[in-house]
Amino acid sequence: MKLSKRGEYALRALIDLGIASELGWPMLQASELATKEKLPIKFLEQIFTQLKAAGYVKSRRGKFGGYSLGRPMNQIKFGAVIRLIDGPLAPIRCVSQMAYVRCSCPDEVHCGLRMLMLDVRNAIAKLLDRYTLADIVEITLRKLRRDKVTPPFLSRSTKLRSVLPPVLNRLGDGGRKFNSVGPTSGKRRK
């Protein structure tokens, strides 16, 4: 599996929409996201078309329009989004669950390479299917607060100090139980 630029930008856009939603900005314009992510707006709009067709985002036209999340963040799994944008997670097609193609190996059942790649595919799928957009937004918000950084698309009129503390208070632990890769057992990472 290799994450394409299209897949990377789709995930980053969803994270931005999730952060904006948590911070009280339910709609973001494509131009704001394109500026933040430094990519052509037409490319981002193509990505949003795919995400919208699958129900991950919704849009509203007009001066105050833009894009927002189409589902609750805890229902958006990273594995599903990557499969939508980039296709199967499998490193070789003979281990794919979405696009299986028999390989050239004469004995597929006993092929060592296939067994290894099946383990790789399963590990990737398990990890990506475990994380939801809510998980990543929560981790990101905690890091932003810790580092006192304002998301670029919120700098237009919102200050970090007034917005992030109430959000983190709703999270319950003030950001202490998450490290850079996910939940910890109450220990802080050094």
Residue ranges and their predicted role:
Residues 72-172, 177-182, 189-190:
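Non-DNA-binding regulatory cores of transcription-related proteins
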Residues 55-70:
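Beta-hairpin "wing" of winged helix-turn-helix
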Residues 35, 52-53:
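Alpha-helical residues within the helix-turn-helix
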Residues 48-49:
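Short, hydrophobic-biased segments on the C-terminal half of alpha helices
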Residues 27-38:
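A short alpha-helical element within helix-turn-helix/winged-helix DNA-binding domains
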Residues 10-24:
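Short amphipathic alpha-helical interface segments
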